Amino acid sequence: MKQLFRKWHTLSELKKELTNRNWFPATSGNISIKVSHEPLTFLISASGKDKTKTTPDDFLLVDHQGNPVLETELRPSAETILHTHIYNHTNAGCVLHVHTTDNNVITNLYEKEVMIRNQEIIKALNIWEEGATIHIPIIENYAHIPLLGEAFKKHIQSDCGAVLIRNHGITVWGKDSFDAKKRLEAYEFLFQFHIKLLSIQGGVSSGANSYS
């Protein structure tokens, strides 16, 4: 029980930090943190809650299928299936899904992925190669959640990663809450930089990687 309370506090503090950046507009987004590995349980944000408020009903404990462990009237977030896929296929400890203007704009510029290279902050992703290039996959925003989950699952390849959903934010995961937040901050910085650079250069050149 002590572990559950400790994880709850960590997730609540993380929610406050991300809320202060306006990364949960209009109740959007969801976050989770692993509580136990065997059996797999994790805390996830409840659906439809105003994340600018802190209440006892902010999160609920769910199992490996995303079903509530304890009796509750709360509903887990609609995208819980994305979190279950990550926890079931990796050793990740925290998953963050946020909607920002920049990550939505990026998904309207490119079709299958966005490629960014030679930025110092890429090292925050534990990539130390000089002049490194990263590729962030983009999937379609399928209304049918199981279909969205299947498209998403194809890009779960390690204990840390990120997937953009067209017009539906980014999902980032890492080994723990610190790692996941650091990665999310890095991606959002890179998206903001990329969009600003394109605005100076005159936009995305037409080609295979141009969605507009």
From Swiss-Prot:
Reaction catalysis annotation: 5-(methylsulfanyl)-D-ribulose 1-phosphate = 5-methylsulfanyl-2,3-dioxopentyl phosphate + H2O
Residues engaged in binding Zn(2+): H97, H99
Single GO biological process annotation from the record: L-methionine salvage from methylthioadenosine
E.C. no: 4.2.1.109
Keywords assigned: Amino-acid biosynthesis, Lyase, Metal-binding, Methionine biosynthesis, Zinc
GO molecular function, one term: zinc ion binding
HAMAP family membership: Salvage_MtnB
Taxonomy, superkingdom: Bacteria
Assembly information from the UniProt record: Homotetramer.
Protein name: Methylthioribulose-1-phosphate dehydratase
Manner of cofactor binding, per the entry note: Binds 1 zinc ion per subunit.
Cofactor dependency: Zn(2+)
UniProt-listed SMART domains: Aldolase_II
Signal peptide: none
GO cellular component: cytoplasm
Pfam families given in the database record: Aldolase_II
Originating species: Bacillus cytotoxicus (strain DSM 22905 / CIP 110041 / 391-98 / NVH 391-98)
Pathway: Amino-acid biosynthesis; L-methionine biosynthesis via salvage pathway; L-methionine from S-methyl-5-thio-alpha-D-ribose 1-phosphate: step 2/6
PANTHER family linked to this entry: METHYLTHIORIBULOSE-1-PHOSPHATE DEHYDRATASE
Family, similarity comment: Belongs to the aldolase class II family. MtnB subfamily.
InterPro entries linked: Aldolase_II/adducin_N, Aldolase_II/adducin_N_sf, MethylthioRu-1-P_deHdtase_MtnB
Chain's role: Catalyzes the dehydration of methylthioribulose-1-phosphate (MTRu-1-P) into 2,3-diketo-5-methylthiopentyl-1-phosphate (DK-MTP-1-P).
NCBIfam families in the record: PRK06754.1, salvage_mtnB
